[in-house]
Amino acid sequence: MTFSEQPAIANTPSDTDTVPGVATPLTQTVTAAADRTTQAPYLRIENVRKTFGKFVALKDIYLDVYPGEFVCLLGPSGCGKTTLLRIIAGLEQQTQGRVLQGGKDVSHLPPSMRDFGIVFQSYALFPNLSAIQNVAYGLQNQKVPKAQIETRVSELLDMVGLGGMGHKYPAQLSGGQQQRVALARALALSPGLLLLDEPLSALDAQVRIRLRAEITDLQRRLGITTVMVTHDQAEALAMADRIVVMDKGYIAQVGTPHSVYQHPTSPFVANFIGVMNFLDGVVEADDTVRCGNILLTAPHNTVPPGQAVVIALRPEDMRVIDTPSATPVPNQVKAEVLGREFLGAGYRLDLTLEGNARQPIALEISANRARAMGVESLTALTIQLPPEMIRVFPKENP
């Protein structure tokens, strides 16, 4: 899929299209904003801190989410992402700071007074109600006329791929179908904000991949501002306009999926997003790092000479050199093959570098390339660590 830098914004319908308590037509066109930075944020998290006794769960969080944007809160267990989502929803009260939605301070409003729909990991459907009744529940509480409820529920069930299944009860539906009902229910009242609390983590792999594509497509079509919590890197990379990487209660990095993956700002982010090789080294010159007995050119280095560093390089970014080049190849290194792992579409080779055998690294190659190389019997090869792909970080004290 394409990772867009711009949010999706729904065209404003005419007054005649708007019915209180019922969504605007689902076929409305969605356009991309020319530049989201020119818009006011729809959701603003301002200096939010949360403590549980002496434990600090969130440390002075600042975050803007723009209209129509899909933002993923990504991080390991205990990083604070779910606590932040609960504060946005009003299910948890922040210790300090403010939450603003649509320019309005909602920091101390109860969930019932906030404008959002939410989907939980556990679906949270009423087991004694059919799919139709679950989706209609909020509309009935808002006293929407029966005919409009029927039309709206039918539209929503069709939209999530459950047309003709509204009579079924949760126990008669698969996990993916139940989550679709939960999503339709969250959208029933046309909220300004959609919150997703690890909505796919309870599903099997194939259903999860299919449903994440459906949710992303639906969010783009409706242009609804969305915040999703996940610990799954693949979900965040595939679905988000921007990823907020969290660690130990603070925001480690915010950026597009491409920028966070290709340009991590810390070893934590580099290691948490995807697979990363790390080598210890010392900066010898502005663009040169020594790792063991290997001198590597690193043009992106900003660490002063003499400082201990960690260099990072992704397995798929390294290159195999099949034949000698007429011109010198920077960062060319001989390597011994320690092991190989078949990944389906390719192989991951475990290597040690000549001149730095104490730190094994991984190299990923396509299945076609692996067959051409005779990977099953391969014991040694020559590789390049491309200078432009190397990231250099100051070595952190243990």
Task: Please place each PLM-identified region on the residue numbering.
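ABC ATPase nucleotide-binding domains
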Residues: 70, 109-268
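The feature captures the beta-strand-to-loop junction immediately N-terminal to the Walker
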Residues: 74-76
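Helix-to-loop junction immediately C-terminal to a conserved catalytic motif
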Residues: 89
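Conserved ABC transporter NBD signature motif
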Residues: 97-105
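Non-catalytic connector elements of ABC transporters
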Residues: 2-26, 31, 276, 287-398
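Conserved coupling/switch loops of ABC nucleotide-binding domains, chiefly the family-specific signature
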Residues: 95-98, 148, 248, 280
